[in-house]
From Swiss-Prot:
A cellular component term, taken from the record's GO annotations: apoplast
GO biological processes: cellular response to nitrogen starvation; nitrate import; regulation of leaf morphogenesis; regulation of root development; regulation of shoot system development; response to ammonium ion; response to osmotic stress; response to salt stress
Subunit structure comment from the entry: Interacts with CEP receptors (e.g. CEPR1 and CEPR2).
Name of the protein: Precursor of CEP4
Gene from which the chain derives: CEP4
Propeptide: 31-64, 80-86
Hydroxyproline found at: 68, 73
Upper classification of the organism: Eukaryota, Viridiplantae, Streptophyta, Embryophyta, Tracheophyta
Cleaved signal peptide residues: 1-30
Region annotated Disordered, chain positions: 63-86
Induction of expression: Slightly induced in roots by nitrogen and ammonium chloride NH(4)Cl starvation. Accumulates in response to osmotic stress (e.g. mannitol and salt NaCl).
Amino acid sequence: MVSRGCSITVLFRFLIVLLVIQVHFENTKAARHAPVVSWSPPEPPKDDFVWYHKINRFKNIEQDAFRPTHQGPSQGIGHKNPPGAP
C-alpha cells in the first residue's frame, strides 16, 4: 500500500507540472494572432498564342541587340591586349 506522504508528493508534482504546462500554453496562445487571409478571384488563364508571341518578340530583340558588327573573331577575346587597353 502507498503511504500518504508519497501520494501527496506525487499529487503535488503532478499539479506543478500541470501548472507549468498551462502557463506555457497560455503564453503561446496569447502571442499568436489570427492570420489575415485576403481572397482575390483567380486570374483568367492566358491565351497560349499571346504568351508564345510575347516570348518570341523579346527573343528577336535580344538577337538583334547582340549581332556582331563585322566578320572575324570577337574583339577582346583571345587577344593579350584587348582594344582600348593602354
